[in-house]
C-alpha cells in the first residue's frame, strides 16, 4: 500500500462534501476510539467568592428630564429618535419626566442623549 502524504489527504478532503466529511470523522472516531469534541476546560475557582462583580448593564432607558428653552427643537429630535408623530412627541415632551427610549443598547442611548442635549434638553440615561 502506497503511503499518502498530508497534502494528498488535504486535497482529498477538499473534494468531499460536508456529509462525507462528517461520516469520515465518525468512522475515524470509531476506528481509533477518540472523540473530535474539543475538551472543556474546568473553570478555576474564584479567589474570593464574595467579591463577585455585578453584571454589566446591557439595556438602558433614555429619560427626558426637561425640554429647556428650545422646546420645538426637542420635539423634532424626539420625533427623529422615536419615529412618533407630532402630537405624540409633543405629549411626551410636555409630560416630563418621560422615557424617550426603553431598553436601548449603550450606543443608541448615548447617541439619543447627545441629540437631545444638543437640542437643549436635559436628559438622563438609566
From Swiss-Prot:
GO molecular function: mRNA binding; structural constituent of ribosome
InterPro entries registered for this protein in UniProt: Ribosomal_bL12, Ribosomal_bL12_C, Ribosomal_bL12_C/ClpS-like, Ribosomal_bL12_oligo, Ribosomal_bL12_oligo_N_sf
A Pfam family that the UniProt record links to this protein: Ribosomal_L12
Cellular compartments per GO CC: cytosolic large ribosomal subunit
Family of this protein: Belongs to the bacterial ribosomal protein bL12 family.
Gene: rplL
Quaternary structure annotation from Swiss-Prot or TrEMBL: Homodimer. Part of the ribosomal stalk of the 50S ribosomal subunit. Forms a multimeric L10(L12)X complex, where L10 forms an elongated spine to which 2 to 4 L12 dimers bind in a sequential fashion. Binds GTP-bound translation factors.
Keywords: Ribonucleoprotein, Ribosomal protein
Lineage of producing organism: Bacteria, Bacillati, Actinomycetota, Actinomycetes, Micrococcales
Record's protein name: Large ribosomal subunit protein bL12
GO terms under biological process: translation
Keyword field contains Cytoplasm: no
Transmembrane segments: none
Protein source organism: Tropheryma whipplei (strain TW08/27)
Role: Forms part of the ribosomal stalk which helps the ribosome interact with GTP-bound translation factors. Is thus essential for accurate translation.
Signal peptide: none
Amino acid at each position: 500500500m502506497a503511503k499518502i502524504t498530508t497534502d494528498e489527504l488535504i486535497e482529498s478532503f477538499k473534494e468531499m462534501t460536508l456529509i462525507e466529511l462528517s461520516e469520515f470523522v465518525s468512522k475515524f472516531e470509531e476506528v481509533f476510539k477518540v472523540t473530535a469534541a474539543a475538551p472543556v476546560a474546568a473553570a478555576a475557582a474564584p479567589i474570593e467568592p464574595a467579591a463577585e462583580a455585578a453584571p454589566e448593564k446591557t439595556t438602558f432607558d433614555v429619560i427626558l428630564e426637561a425640554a429647556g428653552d428650545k422646546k420645538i427643537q426637542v420635539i423634532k429630535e424626539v420625533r427623529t429618535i422615536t419615529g412618533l408623530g407630532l402630537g405624540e412627541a409633543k405629549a411626551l415632551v410636555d409630560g416630563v419626566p418621560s422615557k424617550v427610549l426603553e431598553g436601548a443598547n449603550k450606543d443608541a442611548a448615548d447617541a439619543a442623549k447627545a441629540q437631545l442635549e444638543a437640542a437643549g434638553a436635559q436628559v438622563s440615561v438609566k
